[in-house]
Amino acid sequence: MAVPFVEDWDLVQTLGEGAYGEVQLAVNRVTEEAVAVKIVDMKRAVDCPENIKKEICINKMLNHENVVKFYGHRREGNIQYLFLEYCSGGELFDRIEPDIGMPEPDAQRFFHQLMAGVVYLHGIGITHRDIKPENLLLDERDNLKISDFGLATVFRYNNRERLLNKMCGTLPYVAPELLKRREFHAEPVDVWSCGIVLTAMLAGELPWDQPSDSCQEYSDWKEKKTYLNPWKKIDSAPLALLHKILVENPSARITIPDIKKDRWYNKPLKKGAKRPRVTSGGVSESPSGFSKHIQSNLDFSPVNSASSEENVKYSSSQPEPRTGLSLWDTSPSYIDKLVQGISFSQPTCPDHMLLNSQLLGTPGSSQNPWQRLVKRMTRFFTKLDADKSYQCLKETCEKLGYQWKKSCMNQVTISTTDRRNNKLIFKVNLLEMDDKILVDFRLSKGDGLEFKRHFLKIKGKLIDIVSSQKIWLPAT
């Protein structure tokens, strides 16, 4: 059943987790409003309380249609709560088919929106430093939102730019200068990461483990061996743009204003491609009312801890630039006075909150929390009951060599290593819904594309028990 949070609010789904806490979906059972709650245990973040404070401070500065909106925060004892928009469309990586990618018009539209968000961030002097599909979320209209500012920093203040020296991010997405130089400019680093995201969208795979000469795939790229994967899967026009983005020398790397002049960037979408009505900011218009977006990835993933660059001090009480603060108040009653002051006990197993079919309801019902659950393609119905489904899943995962741990009732944690020998952890919930069992996989730690590869492998082994029934999702 749903876990009560505070008066009138229930926690109904774990959206993400990381070193210091998790993100939960909270739904108001009276108004049906949804909000993402990032719950940070400050006792687990004793080594970096300033990082949390800086993340809050940066979030307060943000107001853009391609950036997840921040409503506010409050602290209760050792727990810090950040309230953010909920993105019911899930994470971008879920739309990327491993080794295939996505239709080029979709990739172009998402790339346009990514550029709009990054232009906005750089315009107010902020660099994200961990752009990757796991940190790019989609709303109910499939509009892209940049999320997770745990590694973000201010690189320009009062028109004065400072060089950065902290090596942080996620290795396949980091720019080569992070691995080679003591200091570097902020903007080209984010541009490079956007190029890797575009590659993943078009080819369904990452080009290399890291951009260093010790990596054969990266050396092949520098030698222009585009007859190899992933480049041979990419059409010549977007590949020409990638040749300008993924340039080792940051001073020779294309800038965003020039990206916007690129031939492929301005190529009209193919006939028949899904092209929602857009506003001037590049975002589809959506009905008025409470937006539903989420900040999901909590994985602070430093590549290495270099000497501290953070000479600028941040305080959550320091004044921020005026960025339309009134827009934060997305009432009713300012998100119920930021979810009513908060005082509650954390559930021991928050994912168990989805196990009740009464909670999930049926498609079309007026009060239907299932409509609030994040969309995922990594789920399927089975033809069996819960016990038999669990047993088949367990036997299959053990045969495939996965580490298997029952977390709590109807939830298991599966661990393995991916093709890059990095840790990959995902949670599987068996959910009762309308007398059927939904097997729902969620990435907990690791690379999203690798997670999808493993999901498809497991599903393939279970094909005899997978129901042909389509997963019902909220209409968009």
Curated annotation (Swiss-Prot):
Residues 391-476 are annotated as: Autoinhibitory region. Residues 1-265 are annotated as: Interaction with CLSPN. Changing R376E: In 3RE mutant. Disrupts the folding and/or conformation, allowing increased accessibility to FBXO6 component of SCF-type E3 ubiquitin ligase complex. There is a cross-link at K132, K436 (Glycyl lysine isopeptide (Lys-Gly) (interchain with G-Cter in ubiquitin)). Expressed ubiquitously with the most abundant expression in thymus, testis, small intestine and colon. Residues 9-265 form the Protein kinase domain. Activated through phosphorylation predominantly by ATR but also by ATM in response to DNA damage or inhibition of DNA replication. Activation is modulated by several mediators including CLSPN, BRCA1 and FEM1B. Proteolytic cleavage at the C-terminus by SPRTN during normal DNA replication activates the protein kinase activity. This is Serine/threonine-protein kinase Chk1. The gene is CHEK1.
